[in-house]
A protein has these predicted regions:
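Structured-RNA-binding interfaces characteristic of tRNA pseudouridine synthases
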Residues: 1-247
């Protein structure tokens, strides 16, 4: 049989997973996909993911590829996998792609959304997919502060101190902040994100929204290139990888 490469669009509820990437500490999305594909194809399968989301982070449109000699057509893998995967992982789409397609080494725009429930008490139905903030957030201040981040900047202040990456320059193409009822939606798109970058941006915006920090502090935080100058890292559960668009 000839080897082929198949692309998957993967959605998952990250609540019960220790992130995407295989690790010894607990079950991960990548591990479940590897095991399920290996059983389906009767061969050893290892997927390559576009975004290695953290423990507790969700996804609507992560991308993964794998190579297989299976006779199953590329577009049929979504149905076949969804019959076997746990209910908190679903394949939105599958297709055969060029043998040299790599989900991490292409020009992309990634879009993340962070949800904040801003009201007097939490809601059980939202607790796994948003972070709860009791005190009122000033969304207009948050919008004005976020606008400073659009464009190409050195985001070292918004990168986890544990990260070993040398180049911390990234481009944010768009940030929108909308409040629908009691839920605040922060949507951020860009050509790549540093480790914990979105969650640190959100934590900083929450400080501004609460009036703890002035709304004009973003420029000085960027210029500092110092993680300690930005806000805390927001909880993982409020973050969802919405889409990865290949350019």
């Amino acid at each position: 049989m000839n080897m082929k490469r198949v692309k998957l669009i993967v959605a998952y509820d990250g609540t019960n997973y220790c992130g995407w990437q295989v690790q010894i500490n607990g079950i991960t999305v990548e591990e479940v996909l590897n095991r399920t594909l290996s059983e389906l194809c009767h061969e050893d399968i290892k997927v390559i993911g576009a975004s290695r989301t953290d423990s507790g982070v969700h996804a609507l449109g992560n991308v993964a590829v794998f190579d297989t000699e299976s006779g199953i057509p590329g577009e049929k893998f979504s149905f076949a996998l969804n019959q076997r995967l746990p209910e908190d992982i679903r394949i939105q789409e599958s297709c055969q792609v060029a043998d040299d397609f790599h989900p991490r080494y292409c020009d992309t725009i990634k879009t993340y959304e962070y949800k904040i429930l801003n009201r007097r008490f939490d809601m059980p139905t939202e607790r796994l997919y948003s972070t709860f903030v009791y005190y009122p957030l000033d969304v207009d201040k948050m919008k004005r502060a976020a606008a400073v981040l659009v464009g190409e900047h050195d985001f070292k202040s918004f990168c986890s101190s544990r990260s070993q990456v040398e180049n911390t320059v990234r481009t944010i193409t768009d940030i929108t902040i909308d409040k629908v009822g009691d839920m605040i939606h922060i949507r951020i798109s860009g050509n790549g994100f540093l480790y914990n970058m979105v969650r640190i941006i959100v934590g900083t915006l929450m400080k501004i929204g609460l009036g703890i920090w002035p709304e004009d502090c973003m420029e000085s935080i960027l210029e500092a290139k110092d993680r300690t100058k930005a806000g805390p890292k927001a909880e993982a559960k409020g973050l969802t990888l919405v889409e990865i668009k290949y350019l």
